[in-house]
Amino acid sequence: MAAPSGTVSDSESSNSSSDAEELERCREAAMPAWGLEQRPHVAGKPRAGAANSQLSTSQPSLRHKVNEHEQDGNELQTTPEFRAHVAKKLGALLDSFITISEAAKEPAKAKVQKVALEDDGFRLFFTSVPGGREKEESPQPRRKRQPSSSSEDSDEEWRRCREAAVSASDILQESAIHSPGTVEKEAKKKRKLKKKAKKVASVDSAVAATTPTSMATVQKQKSGELNGDQVSLGTKKKKKAKKASETSPFPPAKSATAIPAN
């Protein structure tokens, strides 16, 4: 259904005149304002834009414009509710035709996995075997250590356990060694030892000074003892001579040996 030709020509002429005015305004705005003056319009030489506008008014286009259509682009004159209803029906119809088969997916996955395992990586040499790295990296089962029945092994294990074991008392002792109280105690002990050493040195010097006098006294005592022994021997001989004279009837003859010299 086409509109009458008179209404179309009037609307096109009004649109072309408004377009020409907009072009003139844009040109005036684009001209620089400094050092240049706008040239006056020449009446004898019309512009190309004016000629084009005249041609457009004299020869209207035969194209069908949707915006100027009476039905405004909606030839069926449908409402949005009707369009939504049709879309829902079409969606349900498509869903009914589409079927999902789960059994067909499983073999496809298995094939993809097999292909991936076979084509995994690349061969560096012609002798290299694909998948050899995975076999090497597979963890080997560890063998359990058999308990040793010998006494030497048990003694060694017990000794290692003792070396590795740390008791709470050991930790406390180590912490006490580095504490400030222990440092003060050690300093006091060192002072006492120094005092004792000084006392011993003074005693030794005193003993060294008194040794010559003590040696002299000891020598005197020894000489006195020797003299006393000699006197005791002379007295014993005198007593024996007296007893012999008393027992014998004849008077003893005087001899030099009988009378000891004092």
Curated annotation (Swiss-Prot):
Domain of life, per UniProt, equals: Eukaryota
Give the compositionally biased regions (Polar residues): 51-61, 210-221
Q: Which residues carry this modification: Phosphoserine?
A: 61, 138
This entry carries the following GO cellular component terms, namely: nuclear envelope
Places the protein is found: Nucleus envelope
Renumbered to this chain, the Low complexity biased-composition regions fall at 9-18, 200-209
Q: Please classify the protein's predominant subcellular localization into one broad category.
A: nucleus
Phosphothreonine found at: 79, 182, 211
- Give the residue ranges of motif Nucleolar localization signal (NLS): 236-241
Provide one Gene Ontology biological process annotation: Wnt signaling pathway
Q: Which Pfam families match?
A: CUSTOS
Stretches the record annotates as Disordered: 1-79, 126-262
Q: Where is the composition biased (Basic residues)?
A: 188-199
Q: Which UniProt keywords apply?
A: Developmental protein, Nucleus, Phosphoprotein, Wnt signaling pathway
Record family assignment: Belongs to the CUSTOS family.
Q: What does this protein do?
A: Plays a role in the regulation of Wnt signaling pathway during early development.
This one is known as: Protein CUSTOS
UniProt source species = Homo sapiens (Human)
Give the taxonomic lineage as stored in the record: Eukaryota, Metazoa, Chordata, Craniata, Vertebrata
The encoding gene is CUSTOS
